[in-house]
Amino acid sequence: MAAVNDMPGPITVLIVVPTLDAGAADVGAVELVRILERTDHRAIVVSRAGRLVADVIAAGGEFVALDVDTKNPLRMLSNAAVLNRLARERGCSVIHALGRSCAWSACIAARLAGIPFVTSWYKGFREQNLFKRLYNSVMARGARVIATSEQLAQLVNDRYGTPWEKIAVVPSCIDFQPFEPGKVTPERIAALRKSWGVQPSTRIILVTGRIVRRKGHHIAVQAAKRLMELGLTDFLCVFVGEDRGHTGYTGDLWDLVLSTGTMDVIRMAAPVGDMPAAYAAADIVVSAAIQPEGVQRAILEASAMARPVVVSDLAAGPDVILTAPAVPESRITGLRFAAGDAAALAAALLRLLSMPEPEAAAMGQRGRAWVLGHFNTSVGTEQILRVYGEIVPRTGQPAVLPRAH
């Protein structure tokens, strides 16, 4: 294995990401810029413009606007030519793609430029047909394939036969400084509760994730219905994600809320700018994903804020949330349920809502200690630089790229 600094000097990484808004890959691109810039390397980010462009620039990266979020083959080829030229002009050592829609252009450009191609997986992808499988397969064609969780690494190996020596597990890592429970003032918490219309005695279940079907908000609604049937009414499920144009699913959710009679315990709130306060206001934080996810930043952030978490078995692996029977009950940092099983989610929520406050607080503190020790930026920096060090040639000559399988 290459050493962390086993590179021929400072390198320039061309990071290609479909958008720079709020998704896991978008935020991951910004964190990658921070890692590179603070270790005396250089980052160039190519993407469609978005709210995180300012963060890229503030972190020391260079931003190049290009609409790489496309499935049009002609546009992909055109983008590949632009990326190839950019990589050659700026002396890039690696092209790193953080999404499928941009990865084909990035892959072609890397081959044209004679430099390594790297991909990062932040979630699993559905493959309804052979065309979809081919489209997704570009994410397994890198000289290194980075998976943000052990679950995703296993998926890449199982689905595409990618050799384990080409797969690197590099979890999303967080700058935890803003997520310090003691730094969140009561006024910030009160302001959020007021904006959500929450009564003082009401307990908050914060449901994370953008409003898209794969995040499982409909499972949370069904679980809320089951809690009501058990006689619980002193809780409120707050959805704080954006729908980003997925109005069809949002409409389906509203229909489900109306048909289940859960209007009084479901709140579809606007996206929150003060997430540390949102976690602090919550009694429980939930991720109900029904498709494989990487290491979700929201779960790491919630754990850092010492909140008990409930996750589906596709939302976070055992490396993120410690649950029984993998660890003794005295060491668990949250609860896990079978993805798509509303009854199991309701049972997990009922257990936490019924738990004595000191016991729930202790669980939250264990979660905080775990994520701060295993998902901090120092760990992420070492891991990502090791990946680059393994593939960037020390001679400075173009790398010999492996043939796609």
Regions found by a protein language model. Give the residues of each.
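Nucleotide-activated donor-binding/catalytic signature segment of Leloir-type glycosyltransferases, i.e.
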Residues: T250-A270
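Short His-centered aromatic/hydrophobic patch
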Residues: A97-A103, W121
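A conserved, positively charged/aromatic
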Residues: R111, F117-A147, Q154, G161
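Conserved acidic donor-binding segment of nucleotide-sugar-dependent glycosyltransferases
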Residues: L322-A342, R351-E357
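Carbohydrate-associated surface elements
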Residues: Q151, C173
